[in-house]
Amino acid sequence: MTNMVRWLFSTNHKDIGTLYFIFGAIAGVMGTCFSVLIRMELARPGDQILGGNHQLYNVLITAHAFLMIFFMVMPAMIGGFGNWFVPILIGAPDMAFPRLNNISFWLLPPSLLLLLSSALVEVGSGTGWTVYPPLSGITSHSGGAVDLAIFSLHLSGISSILGSINFITTIFNMRGPGMTMHRLPLFVWSVLVTAFLLLLSLPVLAGAITMLLTDRNFNTTFFDPAGGGDPILYQHLFWFFGHPEVYILILPGFGIISHIVSTFSRKPVFGYLGMVYAMISIGVLGFLVWAHHMFTVGLDVDTRAYFTAATMIIAVPTGIKIFSWIATMWGGSIQYKTPMLFAVGFIFLFTIGGLTGIVLANSGLDIALHDTYYVVAHFHYVLSMGAVFALFAGFYYWVGKIFGRTYPETLGQIHFWITFFGVNLTFFPMHFLGLSGMPRRIPDYPDAYAGWNALSSFGSYISVVGIRRFFVVVAITSSSGKNQKCAESPWAVEQNPTTLEWLVQSPPAFHTFGELPAVKETKS
């Protein structure tokens, strides 16, 4: 009973962070299964495993996106690493609102349940993650499936809003003595910026999907031209949330990568203030570029010119971050342990994804590339190899602190190389498919596209083998087997620890600090 009470009613940031990790892992496995089903269907031309059920294909696409974004990356990055390490890094005893933290987590399992049940109602929700009307309207999806998906998004959104309020309050009000804003570790800064993005963008999504809900069930016509509405309004509202959302997914990853690159290069981060202002700039600019997802809907030419220019400007702070990471490594005494491998992989692959993003920012080019596999390749390079690589990097970096045991280094490196090879083989050929005009969200294709699709599907099978390696590592590390106890500071940063998590025991005590740590100075 006491164990159940500990986990159900927990107000401890580390316990809640662990729950987020477990939840993210479960959702991630499900999302990966869906992606493999998608790649099996696309492995060769003609109807394959889905037997011609094209609605089911779109349900898989939709569920894959929702699972990976709202139930894997966000819970693991912000809920998992954020909850676990933000209080420790700022020298706080816990989060500002511990019980709010608990409900933030426990809103997610019901939300996941609603999403999964939507697949079992009538023909499921085959709208794509954007849920565009009129396809998501009552005439095209007549059952309750889309309504269930909308409620799922509502719950997940409330969870994220409450969590972000908690993080903002914690970071502003609960820093330890001497921990000024300009001494905050970069991961804490990244979570702070992310929390503001969530707080400002999610209410807009909530408004859009609530309007869609009333369109479907109460005969309003917000998005129905027959009653004076406009489906393009939905797209504006959705993408005003949707674009900040992609930065929400990647910003905490930026913070994690900064810590890792600094630790394994044995140097402080190059240009700390520049890194902070770059993240803030990315956050602000992220709200000013949403219509680059809509270049093909008939926007005015000067509107498209503005959104093209604004989108390209985001590349500037992003470039500052990438060059600062490279400058941190420059002249450093680099150790290629597993976290550093994932961090270097992140920098390389995220840069490729960023370059294809610059290509897509051109409204003229995007007319040709919109809704082709070029776009799929672009955002999977920044998510599947950006956000997910950052998650893996953070896991290997902090797993000793979380479990109190060291991970098997060789298995970790094997995991990296299999995954690196697999994801590249999956997504690089998609650039060629997109340039040849293969459209997204379509389960069949002409024979001309067969070669690259077969290669892509093969790559996804390799990625699954890599993920299986990862769970082997988790199992070995979490069990009290041969692997030895983890030191307070496994990466030997005792000489000059720059962050507080390496000064507490591994794993940290239930109440991390006996007395609040005072930060005297930061050595440069």
Curated annotation (Swiss-Prot):
Looking at its record, which EC class is this enzyme? Answer: translocase
GO process terms (BP): electron transport coupled proton transport; oxidative phosphorylation
Give the enzyme's EC designation: 7.1.1.9
Sites binding Mg(2+) sit at H370, D371
Report the catalytic activity: 4 Fe(II)-[cytochrome c] + O2 + 8 H(+)(in) = 4 Fe(III)-[cytochrome c] + 2 H2O + 4 H(+)(out)
Q: How is the cofactor bound?
A: Binds 2 heme A groups non-covalently per subunit.
Q: Where does this protein chiefly localize?
A: mitochondrion
Question: Which parts of the sequence bind heme a3?
Answer: H378
Cofactor(s) recorded for this entry are: heme; Cu cation
Q: Where does Fe(II)-heme a bind?
A: H64, H380
Q: Got a GO cellular component term for this one?
A: mitochondrial inner membrane
Q: Which UniProt keywords apply?
A: Calcium, Copper, Electron transport, Heme, Iron, Magnesium, Membrane, Metal-binding, Mitochondrion, Mitochondrion inner membrane, Respiratory chain, Translocase, Transmembrane, Transmembrane helix, Transport
Q: What does this protein do?
A: Component of the cytochrome c oxidase, the last enzyme in the mitochondrial electron transport chain which drives oxidative phosphorylation. The respiratory chain contains 3 multisubunit complexes succinate dehydrogenase (complex II, CII), ubiquinol-cytochrome c oxidoreductase (cytochrome b-c1 complex, complex III, CIII) and cytochrome c oxidase (complex IV, CIV), that cooperate to transfer electrons derived from NADH and succinate to molecular oxygen, creating an electrochemical gradient over the inner membrane that drives transmembrane transport and the ATP synthase.
Under what name is this protein listed? Answer: Cytochrome c oxidase subunit 1
Provide the species name: Triticum aestivum (Wheat)
Gene that encodes the chain: COX1
